[in-house]
Amino acid sequence: TAPTAIRSLIALGDAPLEGKSLDSLRVLGTVGEPINEEAWNWYYEKIGKSRCPIVDTWWQTETGGILISNLAGITPQKAAHATFPLPGIQVLLVDENGIVVEGSDSTKGIPSELVQGNLCIKYPWPGILRTTYNDHERCRQTYFSTYENLYFTGDGCSRDTEGNYRITGRVDDVLNVSGHRIGTAEVENAINMYVDVVESAVVGYPHDIKGQGIYAYVILSKDVTDDSLTRQDILQTVTRIIGAIAKPDKIQFVKGLPKTRSGKIMRRILRKIAEGETSNLGDTSTLLDPAVVNEIVVGKI
């Protein structure tokens, strides 16, 4: 099942489990998005009765199959970790410059500190994608151009001293909402289809149930008089164009967006505000109008 479903059950307490026999369960699975430790432990203790192994798999449509996972009853499991690459899968962590991140693997005599990086794969495997809609160049640019001679998954990842891998989430502007990958640009385009929207910017923020929630900053035309009605209309527009899964969890109406002098939206700032990290917004010296940021912080939902 997906971690989102597990978190939803946790919110209901023990009531859904009362009177249920779970004796026939042998193996549990979690897939679709990274699972947090609280959800993993609840799943293991309440559903699996601390006896059923949890298979936490990592894979993508593009990989054609599971690449990182524990093997039920054979290899060790660890809460919230996909654990080890399957045989033949050469996994690497690299920094933003493509330099391989070493460390945190006691089996190789490397110092024991947690390391993080971008998850890449060094060599091809049987299920690897061959093209993207017969557009080979598009495929190359999307998956193989970020780091030379590596397949870039688009995911961030950490590795511990035993060599266990833990997926930390997407490193680009693709949100993982309840296990569904949703592009922020796609949601923005849908929001902007509504007649009274001038401009919008969408970012993700931590959500207890969904993993990531969708936070939308929206500039409305001056003719709008009823914010609540407009908010509902925007949600309906997004549902119609993309689907209910892409509806913003929070919509904040703003007078302006933080932009550089060249017109680029500073999404980093919007993301920090949505996450509640308003005390450390980083460098704002390149903003065209810094006052916009203060207005957004004050109006944060």
Where does each model-flagged region fall?
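Glycine-centered tight turns that cap/initiate beta-strands
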Residues: 24, 88, 138, 196-199, ...
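Alpha-helix/helix-capping structural signal
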Residues: 4-7, 33, 124-127
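Conserved ATP/PPi-binding loop(s) of AMP-dependent carboxylate-activating enzymes
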Residues: 84-88, 99-143, 182, 277-279
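AMP-binding/adenylate-forming catalytic core of the ANL superfamily
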Residues: 125, 130-131, 149, 156-246, ...
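Gly/Ser/Thr-rich phosphate-binding loop
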Residues: 1, 10-79, 90
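A short, polar/charged loop-to-alpha-helix boundary motif
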Residues: 273-285
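Active-site glycine-centered loops adjacent to acidic/histidine catalytic or metal-binding residues
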Residues: 32, 59, 83, 155, ...
